[in-house]
């Protein structure tokens, strides 16, 4: 079983790849759309019992969640 640090490093790699490819998210609606798309891909991977795809899609879901926070969260959360 992977360690938390290894998983987070994989999430960071995916986050950086997606940001380099698509740029920052511009709205919460865009963020939701991207996150839902990745979730649907995760659901498909689970329903086909493709564990390699489940892992890849779960990492993408985590990375897109992080992108929403990084790209759209207010600079001063208070």
Protein language model regions, located:
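Flexible "arm" and connector segments at domain edges
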Residues: 1-78
């Amino acid at each position: 079983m992977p360690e938390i640090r290894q998983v987070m490093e994989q999430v960071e790699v995916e986050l950086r790849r997606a940001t380099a490819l698509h740029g920052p998210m511009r709205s919460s609606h865009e963020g939701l759309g991207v996150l839902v798309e990745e979730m649907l891909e995760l659901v498909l991977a689970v329903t086909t019992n493709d564990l390699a795809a489940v892992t890849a899609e779960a990492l993408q879901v985590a990375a897109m969640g992080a992108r929403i926070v990084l790209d759209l969260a207010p600079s001063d959360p208070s």
